[in-house]
A protein has these predicted regions:
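Surface-exposed, charge/polar-rich loops and edge strands
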Residues: 2-13, 17-27, 166-182, 191-194, ...
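N-terminal active-site beta-alpha-beta segment that forms phosphate/nucleotide-binding
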Residues: 2-65, 70-177
Length: 244
């Protein structure tokens, strides 16, 4: 019987190939729909107070296996009560990511968040010596709208960059507990909200450092949904997954 790591490796190969096979026009359309739902959930109704995230009822048809459906899958394992939500008197901060290859692209949501007055941060990978010292494989850096095209960690998202190698005034480091929301990439997911990443452990390390009030949302295409995602003890389910 295959061990968990082999199962994960095989599933990554299958799902990425399936994702890559989607026509570019379809990926663009799906990403636009995902960004629309992200905007609705995080910008229009920051903590979805009109819905019961702890129930099995989905907000739309997200449990359908049809690739034309879209929806929000609330995990039954990690609800975040509305009475714990932080005040939004200050500028809110959301972490997103720069899409690579055929990934669902949150760029349109990032623009909408900036226009709504949110601060937007992107992951910056850290070199191995700094990983050992801080326990994180990445940090989050704020990027202004007019700086996005020049940010080296956006142009090359997997490139490790020392935390002191970049101008901290231009790209300020944001601690995990400052994030009000985080948009998480994934390779595969299931109905329980289990996420399969790329195997580097970046988000497995980062997610536990977030504030309890941070709203965590994974995004993906419906083609990335599987009946069961293999998992280890260190893997995390996501409270919400938006798919299209």
């Amino acid at each position: 019987m295959e061990d968990i790591s082999e199962q994960k490796r095989a599933l990554r190969h299958i799902v990425i190939a399936r994702r890559d096979a989607l026509p570019i026009e379809e990926r663009v359309h799906k990403s636009a729909e995902i960004c629309r739902q992200l905007k609705q959930e995080l910008l229009d109704d920051p903590f979805n107070t009109s819905s019961d995230a702890s129930s099995d009822t989905v907000l739309t048809s997200s449990l359908s296996t049809s690739s034309s459906s879209s929806g929000i899958l609330p995990s039954t394992q990690q609800s975040r009560p509305s009475d714990q939500h932080r005040s939004f008197d200050r500028a809110k901060t959301v972490g997103v990511y720069a899409a690579m290859g055929s990934e669902a692209d949150p760029a349109a949501f990032a623009i909408a968040a900036e226009q709504a007055g949110w601060r937007v941060a992107y992951p910056c990978m850290l070199p191995s010596d700094e990983v050992e010292s801080c326990g994180q494989r990445m940090c989050m850096r704020l990027v202004a709208a007019n700086e996005r095209q020049d940010a080296p960690f956006i142009l090359r998202p997997t490139r490790p960059i020392s935390i002191n190698a970049l101008d901290r005034e231009r790209y300020p480091v944001v601690s995990a507990n400052e994030l009000d929301a985080l948009v998480v990439p994934l390779v595969a997911f299931d109905a329980d909200g289990m996420r399969l990443g790329y195997g580097g452990g970046c988000y497995d390390c980062f997610l536990p450092a977030l504030a309890p009030t941070c709203k965590i949302v994974g995004i993906a295409y419906e083609e990335q949904r599987f009946e069961r995602v293999p998992s280890d003890a260190h893997d995390h389910t996501l409270p919400y997954i938006i798919s299209a």
